[in-house]
C-alpha cells in the first residue's frame, strides 16, 4: 500500500487554496457595498389563476383552478448598495398556467403559458445572509396553449386543444419573498401576485398566482 505524506510545500499550497476559497465565500456572504453578483438559477413554479366569478351553466358549481407544477430558470444580477440593501434584476423563463379541477362540464383541463419575466426587486438584508425582497415583475407571454375535455350535456366528452387562447400577452406581478445565501448558493422563495387582468373575456377577471422556489449559484463580478 502506497501512502503519500504531504510535505511542507504541499501543506502550504493546500492551506492557501482553503484560505482563498473561504475568503471568496466570505466576500459573497458579507454583502459588501458596491459589489455585483451574477446568479444563474433554476427552480419550480406552482402556478394557478384566479376566477372567482365563473360558474358552470349559471348554476352553483364553481370552476376551480388548482396549482400546476412547472419549470422556471434564468439569471439574476444584483448590485449591493450597502450591507443591508441590494437591487436585483432578473431574466426568467417561467412556465405558468393552471390545472382545472374536474367537474360536470370539464375534465383533464390545463393551460400553459410560457412567460419571459423581468423581475426588478429590492432586497433588504434584515439578518445575516437573509433578505426580504419586493418589487415589480413585467412578464410577456411567448406561447399560450389550453386543452380540456368538455361535456356536451349528454354525457359525451370531446377533447379540445387550442393555441388561440383568451390570455393576454402582458402580465404585471408583485413579487414578495425571501432569499437566503448559503456560501455561494442562494435559495429563493417568493409569491408572485398578479396585478392585471390577463384575459380578454369581458365577463370575468383572471389573475396569475405563482409560488416560485429556486436555487442559484452566485458569481462575484468585481
Please report, for each region that a protein language model flagged, where it lies by residue:
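Bacterial Sec-dependent N-terminal signal peptides
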Residues: 1-37, 41, 215-221
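Residues that define the transmembrane beta-barrel architecture of outer-membrane proteins
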Residues: 34-38, 67-71, 112-116, 168-174, ...
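Residues on the lipid-exposed face of transmembrane beta-strands in outer-membrane beta-barrel proteins
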Residues: 40-44, 71-79, 91-93, 118-126, ...
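Flexible, solvent-exposed loop segments that connect beta-strands
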Residues: 49-65, 95-114, 142-168, 197-204
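Hydrophobic, well-structured mid-protein blocks that either form specific transmembrane helices
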Residues: 86-132
Amino acid at each position: 500500500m502506497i501512502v503519500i505524506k504531504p510535505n511542507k510545500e504541499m501543506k502550504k499550497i493546500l492551506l492557501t487554496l482553503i484560505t482563498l476559497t473561504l475568503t471568496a465565500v466570505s466576500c459573497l456572504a458579507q454583502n459588501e457595498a458596491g459589489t455585483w453578483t451574477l446568479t444563474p438559477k433554476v427552480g419550480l413554479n406552482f402556478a394557478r389563476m384566479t376566477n372567482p366569478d365563473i360558474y358552470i351553466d349559471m348554476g352553483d358549481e364553481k370552476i376551480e383552478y388548482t396549482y400546476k407544477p412547472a419549470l422556471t430558470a434564468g439569471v439574476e444580477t444584483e448590485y449591493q448598495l450597502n450591507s443591508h440593501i441590494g437591487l436585483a434584476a432578473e431574466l426568467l423563463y417561467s412556465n405558468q398556467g393552471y390545472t382545472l379541477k374536474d367537474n360536470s362540464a370539464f375534465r383533464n383541463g390545463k393551460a400553459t403559458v410560457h412567460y419571459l419575466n423581468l423581475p426588478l426587486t429590492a432586497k433588504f438584508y434584515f439578518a445575516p445572509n437573509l433578505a426580504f425582497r419586493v418589487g415589480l415583475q413585467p412578464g410577456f407571454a411567448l406561447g399560450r396553449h389550453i386543452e380540456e375535455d368538455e361535456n356536451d350535456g349528454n354525457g359525451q366528452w370531446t377533447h379540445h386543444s387550442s393555441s388561440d387562447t383568451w390570455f393576454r400577452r402582458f402580465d404585471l406581478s408583485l413579487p414578495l419573498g425571501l432569499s437566503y445565501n448559503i456560501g455561494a448558493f442562494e435559495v429563493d422563495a417568493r409569491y408572485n401576485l398578479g396585478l392585471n387582468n390577463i384575459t380578454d373575456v369581458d365577463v370575468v377577471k383572471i389573475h396569475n398566482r405563482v409560488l416560485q422556489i429556486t436555487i442559484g449559484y452566485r458569481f462575484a463580478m468585481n
